[in-house]
């Protein structure tokens, strides 16, 4: 057991200043290809300005984020299910309108 006075020396002897990077793909294969490049391209949100998508948020958007963050898992899944149903209904409506446009010949390109 280390003495109280020699504890710092023991801990400092365990430190390693070796830099472990992925310079050798044979020794350190990347678990998920592209993750290292992606992580390097991301900026630190603490020191840098907020990303562009966050700068364009309005107060209503923040309220929606807070509301979604406060939902339980079941409620969030119900919300997602509702959005999927809405997207499906919009797709059906768009399909009907495209078919209608085809029958009315308003989508044909002008032939010269």
Swiss-Prot record:
InterPro entries per record: DREAM_LIN52
Q: Which domain of life is it from?
A: Eukaryota
Q: Which GO terms describe its cellular component?
A: DRM complex
Any Pfam family: LIN52
According to its UniProt entry, the protein's GO biological process terms are:
regulation of DNA-templated transcription
Q: How does it assemble?
A: Component of the DREAM complex.
Q: Which family does it belong to?
A: Belongs to the lin-52 family.
Put simply, this protein is called Protein lin-52 homolog
| Source species | Tetraodon nigroviridis (Spotted green pufferfish)
The encoding gene: lin52
